[in-house]
Amino acid sequence: MSRQAALADLQSKVGAEPGVGGWFSVSQELINGFADVTLDHQWIHVDVERTARESPFGAPVAHGFFTLSLIPHLTGMVEPDKPQYPGIALTVNYGLNRVRFPHPLLAGSRIRAHTQLRSVEEVRGNGLQMIHNVTVEVEGVEKPTCVAEMVSRLYFDED
C-alpha cells in the first residue's frame, strides 16, 4: 500500500470510536524487572511487605514509565509479522504529549488500552505522523491509570 493510500485510509478513521486492546496482567515480577532495568527500586514499587504495611495503596505500585512502555504492546502496534499497512519500512515512536497518571497501577492488576486516532499528516521522508489519544484502563477501576497523546510516525518504502 502506498503512503497516499494509507493517508486516505487513516484520515477516514480520525475521531472514530476508540479501538480497545486485550487485557494484560501486570505481575510483581514484571514491575521488579522494570525496576532492575531503570535502576528505580523505590520501596513503593518493589517491597511487597512494606507496601502492605505503609502504603496507602496496600500493594506495590507500577512505575508510571512502566505503563508508558507498555503502550505499544497494549495498542497492538508492535506486531512485525502483521504490519498495519504493507509497504511500511518502519514505525517510530516519536513521543508523547499530555501524559498523566490519574490512578495508581497496582501489582496484580489487569490493564488494557483504548486508542483513538486524533490526527494524521504527511511528514518529510515519505512518512505519516499520527497522534492517538490513549487511555490505559485498569479492570474494575473507574479512573484510568494513564492518559496520553501518543505521537508515532510511519515511514514507507515507496510512495
Identify the meaning behind each predicted range.
Residues 2-93, 159:
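Hot-dog-fold acyl-thioester-processing enzymes
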Residues 1-15, 19, 101-159:
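HotDog/MaoC-like acyl-thioester-processing domains
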Residues 94-98:
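A beta-strand/beta-hairpin structural motif
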